[in-house]
Regions:
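Charged (often Lys/Glu-rich) extended helix/loop segments that serve as interaction or gating elements
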Residues: 29, 34, 38, 43-343
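Secondary-structure junction/capping motif
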Residues: 8-17, 75-78, 281
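Glycine-rich tight-turn/loop motif centered on a GG-T
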Residues: 2-15, 62-64
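Alpha-helix-loop-beta-strand connector modules within alpha/beta enzyme cores
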Residues: 14-29
Length: 343
């Protein structure tokens, strides 16, 4: 831990912990005139958490503010949308605190107009874009402590979303279930200072499928420092201390199965890859919920045969589609570099 008062850390040493346990037992035995016992303890998580690390690849990134120039609203746009534009355009002449109050009200008004049918979805999206651009300027102009009092959690709301190729519910269930905090960091580009603040999002459809508490040097942070992506390069993150039951506790939410695993044996400064265990296939996971591969393939063959007899597809197209479908069933439940049937 980071020796703090956080629920996910400790502010005492291992020796202090041992002294207190031994002292408590010693005092009870002395008071009762009993011999001192041999003490055997089992500190599960502390013993086994270190034996596993989860490696995830970042598959996409979204940001509150994109690289394009802001667009001026049309003349017939809702007045609140025009006011957001005016605030952005004239920001340097405004008080940051006043601007924060104003743009929050304008955005809320646009959302209400949308619910009532007096603003379009495009208006609402445009308002959000202008709002976050103004918030970015406000965060630069205002003192961080003052801003956190006026609008708590802005750093987290402004953070990038790094979408990672995993399921929180399968691979880090304690992060979701009991708010367990896991150390996370990039496993390469370690000689470069991170220049983005991010939260991690998995590829399930669940809004809880994210990590937004990270143990950093000064305590628990709602964001994680990461690097800007590079075109054509992978970006891998290590999630550490996952050896304490995460694989056993994981579930099949959204039908994401067990991940690939590599067993590594350490020998001094050397290591050996003892075993590579393939993750579950789509067919294996579907079998858990009573959708059997043979039945699915037979059903698809009948549908393709019917389509071919009706002249909707050719025999070659039917064979190619069936081959692609079969490869998909045998494929990984997570995103892969190549789609089934890719040529």
């Amino acid at each position: 831990g980071n020796i703090s008062g956080s629920n996910s850390s400790v502010d005492y040493s291992l020796q202090e912990y041992a002294n207190d346990v031994v002292m408590a037992l010693k005092n009870v035995c002395d008071e009762s005139g009993l011999p001192h016992p041999h003490i055997i303890s089992e500190s599960g998580r502390a013993l086994v958490a270190h034996h596993a690390v989860m490696i995830v690849d970042v598959v996409d990134i979204t940001r509150r503010i994109n690289d394009t120039a802001p667009k001026e609203p049309d003349a017939d746009s809702p007045v609140q949308l025009r006011q957001l534009w005016d605030t952005l355009s004239e920001f340097d002449a405004l008080q940051a605190r006043e601007a924060l109050h104003d743009v929050t009200a304008y955005r809320e008004d646009i959302n209400k107009l949308f619910v009532l049918g007096h603003a379009t979805l495009s208006d609402r999206a445009h308002a959000d874009d202008l709002y976050w651009r103004i918030i970015s300027k406000i965060m630069t102009a205002m003192d961080e402590s003052e801003l956190s009092q006026l609008e708590p959690g802005l750093n987290s709301k402004m953070a990038d979303r790094y979408f990672c190729n995993f399921s929180v519910f399968q691979s880090l269930p304690d992060s979701w279930a009991i708010n367990q905090v896991f150390p996370v960091m990039p496993i390469h580009r370690l000689n470069e200072e991170p220049d983005r603040q991010a939260i991690l999002v998995d590829i399930t459809c669940d809004s809880d499928g994210k990590i937004e508490d990270f143990p950093l040097q000064n305590g628990i942070s709602p964001t994680l420092p990461l690097h800007t992506e590079r075109s054509g390069e992978s970006y891998l993150l290590g999630i550490f201390l996952t050896g304490a039951y995460q694989e056993i506790l994981g579930d099949l939410h959204n039908l994401f199965g067990d991940t690939h695993a590599v067993h590594v044996r350490m020998d001094g400064d050397h290591y050996e890859l003892e075993q590579v265990v393939a993750g579950e296939s789509v067919a294996e996971v579907l079998d858990y919920v009573q959708f059997h591969e043979k039945v699915l393939l037979d059903r698809m063959r009948r549908q393709l045969q019917e389509a071919r007899l009706q002249g909707r597809i050719s025999a070659r197209e039917a064979n190619r589609f069936l081959r692609c479908y079969q490869e998909g069933l045998q494929g990984y439940t997570y995103l892969e570099d190549e789609s089934p049937g890719a040529v």
